[in-house]
Amino acid sequence: MPSSAVAAGVAPRERSHTVRAFFFVTAPADPGLLSRLIEPVAKLGAVPSRVHASRESGDGSELSVELRLAGVAPRTAELVEFALRAVVGVRQVMALIEVEA
């Protein structure tokens, strides 16, 4: 049975909002890591609004990377999160995704 909105000839509301996504990644310091982290973002057609990387863990053996996206579809942010978790060498990914006003 069709919903009352469809029966009344009104189109259902589309999910047209965008989100901001913040990703915090830790991994062993490796020369190819940054390019492996940026690649899935580029493949999804997004451009990071910020990328910051620093060597941590006292001896510099660990890399901490902050990656931000703005104005992307919620599904794009979710796919980036999944892709970052699948990058070889990544130990941890923390993601914060919030709806833009």
Task: Give the residues covered by each predicted segment.
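A conserved regulatory-domain signal marking ACT and ACT-like small-molecule sensing domains
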Residues: P2-A101
